[in-house]
């Protein structure tokens, strides 16, 4: 027997028993962005490597360690997309969507990072994101946070997530703070862990995000970014906080929140949970006003967020919030004998045509009554329709409940559609 080929480590199959929960999450995401008037954009999963080097930053962990990069037959360097924002900006610039225009966009699809697989973190993962271009005021920051809060309401996890906010100021303010932070870190260099020492000059703000307890203790005396902000940045942030207060969205200001990508400025935020252990972030984003210009377009204000679907699914499973998933099949149509197959197929087709949202599965492959009812039960259907020679002779169909103890009932063929519509 030939050796069985396995899935690549960290790239998982979503099996038929799992897909209904995924479909529920995806439906909530789609309905939420639709309610806010956002439009979908779909981009390729493979992009030029330079796109991510220029957007994410060459000294970030993603570019240095985690990207799936290869040369094609033309010796061009290509990369499987590790996130969605850069591709969205590239598409917007390329197709003239962003020049002097406002755009509210969303995307959903697979992303790729060569990380160590662990709970809630995989090498292929699915990301949902929202991007707004052309609006620089704090009210649009509030809108994307309101949209994200709506997701938790609809998914039933509002009480299990919390919003953290910070502001990074504009590039000039951040540069002044960067110099002050480097000067502070140099005084404590011998006490920093290896990662923080490496980042101290290349990306010092990421040291604020260190998970090392000793580094965090040192940072207790570090200069505060808020002290380096100008009036415009302070006003933008305070306005955002006032708007969130006005609509009842609770938040915590976290001065250590910096985000892992180089392109953020001013507002940054994360929705976190304590229900997934170390992988606590379920949605993150912020403002990136310089990215469109950085990738060859006209300078354009922008704000957005991204969330990993695997973590949302894991959170719902952890909290045992999966019981309301709709069944894959509503009605299972059986044919009790070869002479009944044609009639059974006609019944199934009539139900699908008359009740377009009804999920109808027909039994195929023959078999006795016991076998067919076993298949019907395994399908998850609420009802089995039994079509035998007696039923055909009397122009009837038997409706057998599979999930309750209610009695089986006979209805005429002319009554069937209305009766099923009433029962489902």
UniProtKB/Swiss-Prot annotation:
GO terms for biological process: histidyl-tRNA aminoacylation. It comes from the Bacteria. This is Histidine--tRNA ligase. The lineage of its organism: Bacteria, Pseudomonadati, Pseudomonadota, Gammaproteobacteria, Alteromonadales. Pfam families: HGTP_anticodon (PF03129), tRNA-synt_His (PF13393). It catalyses: tRNA(His) + L-histidine + ATP = L-histidyl-tRNA(His) + AMP + diphosphate + H(+). It is found in: Cytoplasm. The keyword Protein biosynthesis applies. Belongs to the class-II aminoacyl-tRNA synthetase family. One of its GO terms (cellular component) is cytoplasm.
């Amino acid at each position: 027997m030939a050796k069985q080929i396995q899935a690549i480590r960290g790239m998982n199959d979503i099996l038929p028993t799992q897909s209904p929960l995924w479909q529920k999450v995806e439906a909530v995401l789609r309905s939420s962005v639709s309610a806010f008037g956002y439009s979908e954009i779909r981009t390729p999963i493979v992009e030029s490597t330079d796109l991510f080097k220029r957007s994410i930053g060459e000294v970030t962990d993603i570019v240095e360690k985690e990207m799936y990069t290869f040369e094609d037959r033309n010796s061009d360097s290509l990369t499987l997309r590790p996130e969605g924002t850069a591709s969205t900006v590239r598409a917007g610039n390329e197709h003239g969507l962003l020049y002097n225009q406002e755009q509210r966009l969303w995307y959903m699809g697979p992303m790729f990072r060569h990380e160590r697989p662990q709970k809630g973190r995989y090498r292929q993962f699915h990301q949902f994101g929202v991007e707004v271009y052309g609006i620089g005021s704090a009210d649009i920051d509030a809108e994307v946070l309101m949209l994200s809060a709506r997701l938790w309401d609809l998914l039933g996890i509002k009480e299990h997530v919390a919003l953290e906010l910070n502001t990074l100021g504009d590039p000039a303010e951040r540069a002044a703070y960067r110099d002050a932070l480097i000067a502070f870190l140099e005084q404590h260099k011998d006490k920093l862990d290896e990662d923080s020492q490496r980042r101290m000059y290349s990306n010092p703000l990421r040291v604020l995000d260190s998970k090392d307890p000793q580094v965090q203790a040192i940072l207790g005396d570090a200069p505060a970014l808020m002290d380096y902000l100008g009036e415009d940045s302070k006003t933008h942030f305070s306005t955002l906080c006032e708007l969130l207060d006005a609509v009842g969205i609770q938040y915590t200001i976290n001065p250590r929140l910096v985000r892992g990508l180089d392109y953020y400025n001013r507002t940054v935020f994360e929705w976190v949970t304590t229900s997934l252990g170390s992988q606590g972030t379920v949605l993150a984003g912020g403002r990136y006003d310089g990215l469109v210009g950085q990738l060859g377009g006209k300078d354009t204000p922008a704000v957005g967020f991204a969330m990993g679907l695997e973590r949302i699914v894991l959170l719902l499973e952890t909290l045992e919030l999966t019981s309301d998933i709709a069944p894959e099949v509503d009605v299972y149509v059986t044919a009790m004998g070869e002479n009944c197959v044609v009639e059974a197929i006609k019944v199934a087709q009539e139900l699908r045509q008359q009740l377009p949202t009804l999920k109808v599965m027909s039994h195929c492959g023959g078999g006795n009554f016991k076998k067919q009812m076993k298949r019907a039960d395994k399908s998850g259907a609420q009802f089995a329709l039994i079509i035998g020679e007696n039923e055909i002779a009397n122009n009837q169909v038997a409706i057998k409940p599979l999930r309750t103890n209610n009695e089986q009932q006979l209805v005429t063929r002319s009554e069937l559609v209305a009766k099923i519509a009433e029962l489902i």
